[in-house]
């Protein structure tokens, strides 16, 4: 008798995606982060759903409803901090996942890569809107500053900002629509994840060597299912430690003050996972230029496949490119630090140098070094 998982219309789709899927035999731990992102998404949707049952999207009661969740709802504090710190874990996994793709040349699967960029934008938009919902000081002023950036768009900017706000300032209408979109977006992300996997399974996974792995494949289950479960346990251990021991470590104390349009906080800054982009935005003195640089800091990933000059796919055997890759990582960490600092000497100049270096590495240095490496190998 044929196994039901191979004949049932629904089960056979799952079977070909997670059970009998042929996978390269040499995938390292860097390949765990895709499945970890899936777990993060599921966790965020679940905790978010239960939080939404108690949250009220109204300027008069939003802050108090979050306090009520933490104090009066059974395990509400756990839901709230799992959701807030789950977002941080989500972005840690996202950035490592993208970094893995850059390092091992996975971006040569252009469809999968481009859907991934869309996913990155969607998750960033979702996180931004979620940060506004507790209606603390940083929620309100973060929303005001970031949405106001759209006013830099020539001709339609001001109207566009007021259209998004639903009035002449960030107010009740803004909070309500942000809640609606924050609820909707994770489901759009889930749909995009399916498309991402669909394109990935058209080609099969890349592997650390960057060499076609067709002659040496193993079934996904049990080899990579057990490996993924180990990854889940490790990530959930870190998340649990964060939630139970220092839940506010990654948050901003200003967000424990209710939103007040008449009092601007001394340092307006987004959550830590947006600081690198915020630093790039601030490093350009012109408003429109800053906004363009902000968008391009992520959109630049779309041109990476076109700039791949090496005859080898992966950086595994390219030590010069490896040095540049880790310089890029150091640059991003520097930008993240700068984004959280006040706009004064020496932080401004450090941010400007790091911003230029970030774009230089991706657009100029990496293609050049790839050509040099080809020459060194007499290719």
Swiss-Prot record:
Binds 2 heme b groups non-covalently. Pfam families: Cytochrom_B_C (PF00032), Cytochrome_B (PF00033). The keyword Heme applies. It is a multi-pass membrane protein. Keywords: Electron transport, Heme, Iron, Membrane, Metal-binding, Mitochondrion, Mitochondrion inner membrane, Respiratory chain, Transmembrane, Transmembrane helix, Transport, Ubiquinone. One of its GO terms (biological process) is mitochondrial electron transport, ubiquinol to cytochrome c. GO terms for molecular function: metal ion binding; ubiquinol-cytochrome-c reductase activity. Heme b b566 binds at residues 97, 196. InterPro entries: Cyt_b/b6_C, Cyt_b/b6_C_sf, Cyt_b/b6_N, Cytb/b6-like_sf, Cytochrome_b, Cytochrome_b_C_euk/bac, Cytochrome_b_N_euk/bac, Di-haem_cyt_TM. Its cofactor is heme b. Its main location: mitochondrion. Heme b b562 binds at residues 83, 182. A ubiquinone binds at residue 201. The keyword Cytoplasm does not apply. The chain crosses the membrane at residues 33-53, 77-98, 113-133, 178-198, 226-246, 288-308, 320-340, 347-367. GO terms for cellular component: mitochondrial inner membrane; respiratory chain complex III. It is found in: Mitochondrion inner membrane. The cytochrome bc1 complex contains 11 subunits: 3 respiratory subunits (MT-CYB, CYC1 and UQCRFS1), 2 core proteins (UQCRC1 and UQCRC2) and 6 low-molecular weight proteins (UQCRH/QCR6, UQCRB/QCR7, UQCRQ/QCR8, UQCR10/QCR9, UQCR11/QCR10 and a cleavage product of UQCRFS1). This cytochrome bc1 complex then forms a dimer. Component of the ubiquinol-cytochrome c reductase complex (complex III or cytochrome b-c1 complex) that is part of the mitochondrial respiratory chain. The b-c1 complex mediates electron transfer from ubiquinol to cytochrome c. Contributes to the generation of a proton gradient across the mitochondrial membrane that is then used for ATP synthesis. Belongs to the cytochrome b family. Heme 1 (or BL or b562) is low-potential and absorbs at about 562 nm, and heme 2 (or BH or b566) is high-potential and absorbs at about 566 nm. This is Cytochrome b. It comes from Lionycteris spurrelli. The gene is MT-CYB.
């Amino acid at each position: 008798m044929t196994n039901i998982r191979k004949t049932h219309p629904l089960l056979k789709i799952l079977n070909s995606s997670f059970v009998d899927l042929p996978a390269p035999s040499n995938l390292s731990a860097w390949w765990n982060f895709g499945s970890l992102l899936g777990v993060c998404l599921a966790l965020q949707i679940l905790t978010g759903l239960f939080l939404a049952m108690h949250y009220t999207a109204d300027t008069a009661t939003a802050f108090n409803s979050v306090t009520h969740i933490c104090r009066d709802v059974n395990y509400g504090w756990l839901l709230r901090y799992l959701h807030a710190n789950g977002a941080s874990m989500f972005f840690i996994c996202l950035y490592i996942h993208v970094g893995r793709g850059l390092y091992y040349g996975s971006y040569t699967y252009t469809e999968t890569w481009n859907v991934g960029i869309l996913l990155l934008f969607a998750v960033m938009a979702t996180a931004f809107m979620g940060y506004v919902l507790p209606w603390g000081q940083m929620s309100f002023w973060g929303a005001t500053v970031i949405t106001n950036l759209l006013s830099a768009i020539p001709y339609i900017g001001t109207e566009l900002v007021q259209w998004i706000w639903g009035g002449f300032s960030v107010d009740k209408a803004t909070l309500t629509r942000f809640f609606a979109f924050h609820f909707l977006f994770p489901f759009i992300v889930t749909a995009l994840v399916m498309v991402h996997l669909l394109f990935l399974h058209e080609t099969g996974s890349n592997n650390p060597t960057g060499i076609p792995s067709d002659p040496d494949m193993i079934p996904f289950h049990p080899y990579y299912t057990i490996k993924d479960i180990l990854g889940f346990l490790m990530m959930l251990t870190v998340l649990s430690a964060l939630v139970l021991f220092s839940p506010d470590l990654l948050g901003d104390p200003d967000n424990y003050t209710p939103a007040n349009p008449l009092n601007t906080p001394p340092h307006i800054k987004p959550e830590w996972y947006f600081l690198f982009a915020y630093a790039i935005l601030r490093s350009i003195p012109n408003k429109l230029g800053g906004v363009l640089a902000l968008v391009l800091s992520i959109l630049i990933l779309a041109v990476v496949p076109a700039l791949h000059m090496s005859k080898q796919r992966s950086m595994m055997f390219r030590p010069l490119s490896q040095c540049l890759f880790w310089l890029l990582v150091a640059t991003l960490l520097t930008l993240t630090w700068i984004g959280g600092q006040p706009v004064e000497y020496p932080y401004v100049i450090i941010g400007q140098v790091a911003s230029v270096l970030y774009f230089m590495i991706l657009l100029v240095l990496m293609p050049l070094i790839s050509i040099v490496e080809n020459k060194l190998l007499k290719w």
